[in-house]
A protein has these predicted regions:
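Hydrophobic alpha-helical scaffolding
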Residues: 8-11, 30, 77, 81
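Electropositive phosphate-/nucleotide-binding environments in soluble metabolic enzymes
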Residues: 15, 34, 81-85
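Catalytic beta-strand/loop cores that center a nucleophilic Ser/Cys/Thr
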Residues: 23-69
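Acyltransferase
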Residues: 71-107
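Cysteine-nucleophile active-site neighborhood
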Residues: 1-27
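Hydrophobic, well-ordered secondary-structure elements that form the walls
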Residues: 3, 40, 78
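Short conserved micro-motifs at the rims of enzyme active sites and ligand-binding pockets
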Residues: 12-14, 49-51, 85-88
Length: 107
C-alpha cells in the first residue's frame, strides 16, 4: 500500500473521543499551536504515525498519531478546522505549492 503497516477491524471503537493535536515538528501548524479533533473508528493500524501528540482534554492521556511530511498529513483524527484556522490555511497553501511544483505552472 501507500503507507507502512496494516489496517484491521477491531470489532469495537478504538481511541474514541475528543482530542487536541500538537505537531512534534511544525508543518501544518505554527509552533506551539494545537487543533481540536475527535476519533471514532472501528479500525486500527499497525502504524498510526508519530508526528503528532494527541491529548484527551478530559483525562490528559496522550498518544502518538498522524503521519506528516512536507505536503501531507495522514491519520484517523477528524479535525475541527474552526479550532485553528492556521491549519486550513497551511493545507490550502501546500496544495497550491504542490500543484505549482508538479506542473511547473499555475492553472
Amino acid at each position: 500500500g501507500a503507507l507502512d503497516g496494516g489496517c484491521h477491524f477491531k470489532g469495537k471503537l478504538v481511541r474514541f473521543g475528543y482530542i487536541e493535536l500538537a505537531e512534534k515538528h511544525s508543518n501544518f501548524l505554527p509552533p506551539n499551536e494545537k487543533i481540536k479533533a475527535h476519533e471514532f473508528h472501528y479500525y486500527d493500524s499497525t502504524d498510526n504515525g508519530a508526528d503528532c501528540i494527541a491529548t484527551k482534554p478530559a483525562t490528559g492521556r496522550s498518544y502518538d498519531c498522524v503521519i506528516s511530511h512536507d505536503n501531507y498529513w495522514l491519520g484517523f483524527p477528524h479535525l475541527y478546522y474552526p479550532s485553528n484556522p492556521h491549519f486550513a490555511e497551511s493545507f490550502v497553501r501546500k496544495a497550491y505549492e504542490y500543484r505549482r511544483n508538479k506542473n511547473g505552472k499555475l492553472l
